[in-house]
Amino acid sequence: MTTMSGYTRSQRPRQAILGQLPRIHRADGSPIRVLLVDDEPALTNLVKMALHYEGWDVEVAHDGQEAIAKFDKVGPDVLVLDIMLPDVDGLEILRRVRESDVYTPTLFLTARDSVMDRVTGLTSGADDYMTKPFSLEELVARLRGLLRRSSHLERPADEALRVGDLTLDGASREVTRDGTPISLSSTEFELLRFLMRNPRRALSRTEILDRVWNYDFAGRTSIVDLYISYLRKKIDSDREPMIHTVRGIGYMLRPPE
């Protein structure tokens, strides 16, 4: 078993123990997104490699300010967070995250190992707490457990979504904004559902094309722009905009400030 200290070196990341378990992925089939926050490059490199074995995408932040910025950008499915960081500590990062996001499962991975440290971490909003040194196998197993219990990953077709005053009911296929019904075509509905499943996250045209159209229009990302324009006319007309262009990337849906 591979055991890691704060700045460990390991011959190999986890392989045999978890290698036979089924892969976990997002409801739309895309990879799990992990935000890993730690200021020790040796540790983040090895953990990132281990999570890549799971088929997950890993974004790394080395300080608190970077973590806060990347959280909104990445929209992670799980957050792995050190407490002792050079600027904003992990407890404060989680406090800020929980102000707007109460669902993303979070695991503290830290050298602070007293009982009081654990209690403080868990009562601050974390879902799990591991201390250094640690095993990569156990870390991966704990993250898999958090993800299995995370309701936003197993989204049924009849799910109900809400972002600000915008609601979408998958069962009745009804959409409202501020209580006003909005009529959408089937494609518009699926596009809006994908945007609402990823609020505050910059989504590329290619990713949207892949998830909504399944490459039926391969290479024609202009179809995304066309349907975004349709949605804007229906969702944002005479209201504060929720669908925003992210220059150089694509689009983001976020509630009015």
Curated annotation (Swiss-Prot):
What PANTHER family does its record include?
Answer: REGULATOR OF RPOS, TRANSCRIPTIONAL REGULATORY PROTEIN TCRX-RELATED
The record's GO molecular-function terms, alphabetically, read: phosphorelay response regulator activity; transcription cis-regulatory region binding
SMART domains documented for this protein = REC (SM00448), Trans_reg_C (SM00862)
Q: Which residue ranges carry the DNA-binding annotation?
A: 158-255
Per the record, the domain of life is Bacteria
Occurrences of domain Response regulatory (ranges): 33-147
Endpoints of the signal sequence: none
**4-aspartylphosphate sites (modified residues):** 82
Q: What does the UniProt PTM comment say about this protein?
A: Phosphorylated by TrcS.
Q: What is this protein called?
A: Transcriptional regulatory protein TrcR
Q: Which UniProt keywords apply?
A: Activator, DNA-binding, Phosphoprotein, Repressor, Transcription, Transcription regulation, Two-component regulatory system
> Looking at the UniProt record for this protein, which Gene Ontology cellular component terms does it annotate, in alphabetical order?
cytosol; protein-DNA complex
Q: Which InterPro entries match?
A: CheY-like_superfamily, OmpR/PhoB-type_DNA-bd, Sig_transdc_resp-reg_C-effctor, Sig_transdc_resp-reg_receiver, WalR-like, WH-like_DNA-bd_sf
Q: Which organism is it from?
A: Mycobacterium tuberculosis (strain ATCC 25618 / H37Rv)
The induction annotation reads: Expressed in broth-grown cultures and after 18 hours of M.tuberculosis growth in cultured human primary macrophages, but not after longer periods of macrophage infection. Positively autoregulated.
Single GO BP term: regulation of DNA-templated transcription
**Function, as annotated:** Member of the two-component regulatory system TrcS/TrcR. Activates its own expression by binding specifically to the AT-rich sequence of the trcR promoter region. Also negatively regulates the expression of Rv1057 by binding to an AT-rich sequences within the Rv1057 upstream sequence. The TrcR-TrcS regulatory system may act as a transition regulatory system involved in adapting to an intracellular environment and transitioning from latency to reactivation.
